[in-house]
């Protein structure tokens, strides 16, 4: 993401993860890669959140614009289980009622889910391991960036010169933001050919106020394979982003012409 912070979610359960899950889920849930019909998934979950006990949890995905339940289970004494055929590898979401809790990759194998007041984790299969390693690393970088503000206040209170503090922390902030953006970019590149690449790309794009081509996006697209560019959501975003770039250029030309006309 080209920003230094991610908004936290207002929902009581999904706030346990730093990422704004509800904001990115619509993009995640649409990204599907069809594979063998003979594979099976098994989810074994545990929760230390007492409010979940006795509640029904659902796996949901979007199909043809409609929310569809893929599977469900009741939380009994802090545990829940789901299993079924993995007809496709897809991004799904674990829900309680209408609250999105966490994204998952539904794929062949045993997926271990852990829910607590401070952390959400899914592991045990290759893509879930990759996804949550990515989330953890990016969140840790975000925490370091947020810590710079508190560090500035401490340094000033300790008597440091304000201008010197600004200069030092600005450099530290630029370094951390670059590290985070480079990490996100490389993760997308490394996962061009599976659901994680398009998913994280759309997460990144969802932080923009509207579709637009940024240097980071242009850099990613320079090396992206055709399969990535032809992904429905990626292709739709790029089309809108390029249209917006043309509008921005037209507005610039109109302002320049108006400025020149006013000087005559």
Task: Put a short name on every predicted segment.
Residues 174, 186, 207:
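Short, glycine/charged-rich beta-strand-loop motifs at protein surfaces that mediate ligand recognition
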Residues 37-181:
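A non-transmembrane, solvent-exposed segment enriched in polar/low-complexity residues
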